[in-house]
Amino acid sequence: MNKEEQMICSHLLDLAEACDRRGYPMGSDFLTLNEQNLFLAFSKDKLPPVSMEMCGGYELAERKIIFYKPVGVGEEYPAPISLLSVQPLMKKFSEELTHRDYLGALMNLGISRTKTGDIIVQDKQAYLIVSESIAGYICENLTRIRHTSVMCRQIDWQEFDYKPQVKEIMGSIASVRLDAVIGLAFSQSRSKLTGYISEEKVQVNGKVITSNAYNLK
């Protein structure tokens, strides 16, 4: 764990202690999958008597906040995250916008990545999961992405019907080295995939791995 990761974990533990001390729910910024895993290991046997849940808007969300609630506080205090729908004003003339386009538009509004969760692009529209505190600002100011004029509005979670597409792959490999596993997943030889690993394009549980021989077991 580097110094920055140590600071993040310490801050998250401070939030838990503040929740316990004040008797009021507390939520963190959005965390990467790696930061979530680091904190779970860091906080073992250190958390005060509060309930903790990781919330990202849907079951398989990658980016999540940590939401603490005092003992006895129930669902009357939902996690402080909001769901936004972004659609082109004129679908006929809209561009094929990518995840990078939507994220770039948010960055151009001065919004930190820590305030945004997953961005789900579906056809000509996208869903943005964001911190509750900035939802209104985004709806008012996100009016254009690249050359496409858009409308952004907050919607109820009941309107969110997204199920990530996953593919189960089965096979046999000689070892559980990283290059062997992704070779099986993408049906390519180890030699063709080593470049992806060395170029930091491969993650394991949210952490970038640059060693072909990394053992996944």
Region annotations inferred by a language model:
Residues 1-185:
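Ferredoxin-like alpha/beta domains used as RNA- or RNAP-binding modules
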